[in-house]
Amino acid sequence: MKIILSLIICSQLANTCLDPYTWPEKFDSQYECLTFGYEESLNKMKEIGREEVNEYIVFIKFTCEPVTSAWN
């Protein structure tokens, strides 16, 4: 079974989230998807930067979901 990763960047200050970004590659396991999701979330936080993260109270959430037939 393949797993898809979707990252969602949110601002607690604005009480809103951007549309989910679905990672183009599929993962072979839940573990691979989750560890990659945590790594990419950290990379994105560093890219956004301390100042903007603190100013807009940014947080990132993600999901790892099994691929449905529509994604095959």
Feature locations, PLM:
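A short, exposed loop/beta-hairpin motif centered on an aromatic-Gly-Thr core
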Residues: 18-32
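Short cysteine clusters
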Residues: 10, 33, 64
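Short, mixed-charge low-complexity intrinsically disordered segments
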Residues: 43-72
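Short aromatic-glycine-(Arg/Gly/Cys) micro-motifs in beta-strand/loop hairpins
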Residues: 1-22
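Secreted/processed peptides and extracellular or luminal domains of membrane proteins
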Residues: 16, 23, 39, 70-71
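Short amphipathic alpha-helical surface micro-motifs
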Residues: 4-8, 27, 41-48
